[in-house]
A protein has these predicted regions:
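Conserved ABC ATPase "signature" region
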Residues: 99, 114-133
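A short, flexible loop at the N-terminus of ABC-type nucleotide-binding domains that lies
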Residues: 1-6, 10-27, 69-71, 89
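Catalytic Walker B motif of ABC-type/P-loop ATPase nucleotide-binding domains
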Residues: 162-166
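Helix-to-loop junction immediately C-terminal to a conserved catalytic motif
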Residues: 51
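The feature captures the beta-strand-to-loop junction immediately N-terminal to the Walker
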Residues: 36-38
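Conserved ABC transporter NBD signature motif
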Residues: 58-66
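Conserved ABC ATPase signature
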Residues: 137-141
Length: 260
């Protein structure tokens, strides 16, 4: 079983430290882990570092694979990353974009005839409910549609580690829950999923574990019940709030006011 281990992770930007010796609890396959925290806490920086996109010191291991020091092909074979936004100026269709993502990863994942690869891409699009967009140019899509295509790119190679940066940010309420339900299914198939979320209600409903970041440090880690408390919300977000746990795992956070 390939667990994810992160020890003493440090990142600096122009010699200014932004992540300070982060040690994460061991994360096992089948778990959805949400990274939460206020703006500037280091959530996206941590996720991009896990994806191998930022230089860092420390240790990141997925099973026996050293993710900080392995080569790009080794990393691409096990890891899927969804950025906050896709770059503009991509003239390819959605289907062509997915086929490119398939070719860019594990050589074994890219094996098969052109028809088999197209079928694999179509299956992912259908699973996400966006098969009707297959032939549309990426630049002609709405923000929410582009978000769904970005998720499709991240999952098409069936990675063992899936890193998602705000996958629900441009989606309406229906699609937010659809996407998080899909994320849950991907984890249940034996993957590790680490997802940045601003919506604490979504984090509480869908995550097995929540990691709370503040100013580049790990402030708290545990289950939603252990972490999303009025005391923590006051300490980290500087708000006075009440946490109400409703039916079907839903959580409502009522903010009464800010703390000066």
């Amino acid at each position: 079983m390939s667990v994810l281990e992160v020890k003493q992770l440090c990142v600096a930007y122009k010699r200014t430290p932004v992540l300070h010796g982060i040690d994460l609890p061991t994360i096992s396959p089948g778990q959805v882990v949400a990274l939460v925290g206020p703006n500037g806490a280091g959530k996206s920086t941590l996720l991009r570092t896990l994806a191998g996109l930022l230089p860092a010191t420390g240790d990141i291991r997925l099973g026996s694979l050293d993710l900080l020091r392995c080569n790009r092909r080794e990393r691409a074979a096990v890891l899927g990353f969804m950025p906050q936004t896709l770059p503009d100026g991509i003239a390819l269709s959605v289907l062509e974009t997915l086929l490119g993502a398939l070719r860019g990863g594990d050589p074994l994942a890219a094996q098969g005839s052109a028809r088999q690869k197209q079928q694999k891409a179509s299956d992912v699009l259908e699973q996400l409910g966006i098969l009707h967009l297959a032939l549309r140019p990426l630049d002609g899509l709405s923000g929410g549609q582009r978000q769904m295509v970005s998720l499709a790119q991240a999952v098409i190679r069936q990675p063992r580690l899936l890193l998602l940066d705000e996958p629900t940010s441009a989606l309406d309420l229906r699609y937010q829950n659809d996407v998080m339900s899909m994320v849950r299914q991907l984890a249940d198939q034996g993957r590790i999923v680490v997802v940045v979320l601003h919506d604490l209600g979504l984090a509480a409903r869908w995550a097995d574990r929540i990691l709370v970041l503040e100013r580049g440090r790990l402030h708290a880690a545990g289950t939603p019940e252990q972490t999303l408390t009025p005391a923590l919300l006051e300490q980290v977000y500087r708000v006075q709030a009440r946490v109400e746990r409703c039916s079907q795992g839903r959580v409502q956070i009522h903010v009464d006011g800010s703390v000066s």
